[in-house]
Amino acid sequence: MQTALLKPKIIAVEPLGDHHAKVVMEPFERGYGHTLGNALRRVLLSSMVGYAPTEVTIAGVVHEYSTIDGVQEDVVNLLLNLKGVVFKLHNRDEVTVSLRKDGEGIVTAADIELPHDVEIINPNHVIAHLSAGGKLDMQIKVEQGRGYVPGNVRKFGDESSKVIGRIVLDASFSPVRRVSYAVESARVEQRTDLDKLVMNIETDGVISPEEAIRQSARILVDQLSVFAALEGTESAAEAASSRAPQIDPILLRPVDDLELTVRSANCLKAENIYYIGDLIQRTENELLKTPNLGRKSLNEIKEVLASRGLTLGMKLENWPPAGLDK
């Protein structure tokens, strides 16, 4: 009797529009379509890294319930429009940008002054309408994050939010706008009881639907890897004789699994950093002393580690473990 579980062999991506695609995977054993589809959907909606405006300072405005002379929108609607601007930061976690415009006309996202490593995905997005003599002068803080973070959460923990005139925003960081899935019937040879998983994904353009699927799958694999390494319960005598700290299996993976750029990966290997466990024990200052590894590569490494719940400068006991090849 065959006991091996089927793995999907067909993965098709059908574009449905800008930043919108249908991803089809088959065949799955019966029931696995719903099991994996629901898990992927929840991760896609909650755990993708994105960018959002988190704080705003507007010249002449003390609080969000104000109005601005010469601006059609009140401050509440102005902030709602601002939340619709899709930012993408390269090799940085936060940035403060400026928006200054006067005179009659429409204010769009393209009017925001950006540094070279920040881009706006939807530059035609309308922020406000100015009448003759109207003027708008704003400072906008944009940060990287996950999921949805209410503004009042940061108000209690951030002293900077107490500055008069600084408005703290609710931040929706997720780059995934909508996700749905359906499970249909699939057939392989004589078997007709198999599942086909169809996922419909729409993003804001910061990442593609295909990349969103890849990232969500990696997150699930990382979270489940600890269960794959689970061992049976030890007896009291065995527990007493094996008190060495257990090592997270993620740390035993080669740095190649982080999918860094070729430049960053080669710099790490030149310093004999072959495993993720080797990497996280290095500090930022130590890595910056590595030949050809600059601030851009360092930020890339920090971002990739953060997506896996890791940071630089961590301390590990019992490293390297016995039998680890270099």
Curated annotation (Swiss-Prot):
Region (Alpha C-terminal domain (alpha-CTD)): 247-326
EC number in record: 2.7.7.6
Location of region: Alpha N-terminal domain (alpha-NTD): 1-231
Highest taxon in the source lineage: Bacteria
Tagged with keyword Iron-sulfur: no
GO annotations of cellular component type: cytoplasm; DNA-directed RNA polymerase complex
Gene Ontology terms for molecular function: DNA binding; DNA-directed RNA polymerase activity; protein dimerization activity
Gene3D superfamilies registered for this protein in UniProt: 5' to 3' exonuclease, C-terminal subdomain (1.10.150.20), DNA-directed RNA polymerase, insert domain (2.170.120.12), RNA polymerase, RBP11-like subunit (3.30.1360.10)
Keywords recorded for this protein, A-Z: DNA-directed RNA polymerase, Nucleotidyltransferase, Transcription, Transferase
Keyword Transcription: yes
InterPro entries linked to this entry: DNA-dir_RNA_pol_insert, DNA-dir_RNA_pol_RpoA/D/Rpb3, DNA-dir_RpoA, RBP11-like, RNAP_asu_C, RNApol_insert_sf
Gene Ontology biological-process annotations: DNA-templated transcription
Pfam families (alphabetical): RNA_pol_A_bac (PF01000), RNA_pol_A_CTD (PF03118), RNA_pol_L (PF01193)
Reaction catalysis annotation: RNA(n) + a ribonucleoside 5'-triphosphate = RNA(n+1) + diphosphate
Family: Belongs to the RNA polymerase alpha chain family.
Recorded domain comment: The N-terminal domain is essential for RNAP assembly and basal transcription, whereas the C-terminal domain is involved in interaction with transcriptional regulators and with upstream promoter elements.
Biological role stated in the UniProt entry: DNA-dependent RNA polymerase catalyzes the transcription of DNA into RNA using the four ribonucleoside triphosphates as substrates.
Summary of subunit composition and partner proteins: Homodimer. The RNAP catalytic core consists of 2 alpha, 1 beta, 1 beta' and 1 omega subunit. When a sigma factor is associated with the core the holoenzyme is formed, which can initiate transcription.
Protein name: DNA-directed RNA polymerase subunit alpha
Organism the protein comes from: Cupriavidus pinatubonensis (strain JMP 134 / LMG 1197) (Cupriavidus necator (strain JMP 134))
Gene name of this polypeptide: rpoA
